């Protein structure tokens, strides 16, 4: 199992939570970005810098992630792709992506994008806060526990 992070827009605090979980559980982490990242922990944590361009990092993650992997991303189209492959996805606010909700979230994203482009809605998601951080840490712990238990059964 590998934890993939769509790193360009992922909050630093979320990366730190994942790094701690990686160390505790001895799980590899792969950060994917289209620009060089700040130095990070060594050992289980690696990074890859992909070419600049829209969706290049997403394409890389979608191609490389397997059904046994966890992907951390706020990008709903990427989430839909990895869920279709059988991988697990979580957004930085701790919301789990699954077959039941990813289609609805993709439709809502497209609707909001359309409304914003027409000037009917302004702004984006609420500012990232302490509650989001706690929700993410809790979700990450639950998901990793479940995935590791399932991996042991196989």
From Swiss-Prot:
Q: Which cysteines are joined by disulfide bonds?
A: none
The record ties this protein, via Pfam families, to: DUF188
InterPro entries named in the record: UPF0178 (IPR003791)
Instruction: Note the CDD domains from the entry.
Output: PIN_YqxD-like (cd18720)
Instruction: Specify the protein name.
Output: UPF0178 protein Glov_0658
Q: Which organism is it from?
A: Trichlorobacter lovleyi (strain ATCC BAA-1151 / DSM 17278 / SZ) (Geobacter lovleyi)
Question: Upper lineage ranks?
Answer: Bacteria, Pseudomonadati, Thermodesulfobacteriota, Desulfuromonadia, Geobacterales
Q: What is stated as this protein's family in its record? A: Belongs to the UPF0178 family.
């Amino acid at each position: 199992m590998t934890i993939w992070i769509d790193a360009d827009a992922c909050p630093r605090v979320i990366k730190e939570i994942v790094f701690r979980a990686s160390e505790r559980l001895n799980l590899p982490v792969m950060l994917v970005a289209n620009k060089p990242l700040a130095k990070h922990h060594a050992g289980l944590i690696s990074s890859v810098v992909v070419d600049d361009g829209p969706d290049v990092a997403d394409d890389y993650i979608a191609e490389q992630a397997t059904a046994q992997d966890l992907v951390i991303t706020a990008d709903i189209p990427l989430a839909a792709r990895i869920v279709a492959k059988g991988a697990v996805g979580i957004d930085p606010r701790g919301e789990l992506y699954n077959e039941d909700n990813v289609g609805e979230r993709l439709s809502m994203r497209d609707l909001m994008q359309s409304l914003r482009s027409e000037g009917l809605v302004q702004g984006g998601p609420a500012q990232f806060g302490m509650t989001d951080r706690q929700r993410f840490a809790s979700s990450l712990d639950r998901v990793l526990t479940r995935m590791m238990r399932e991996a042991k059964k196989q």
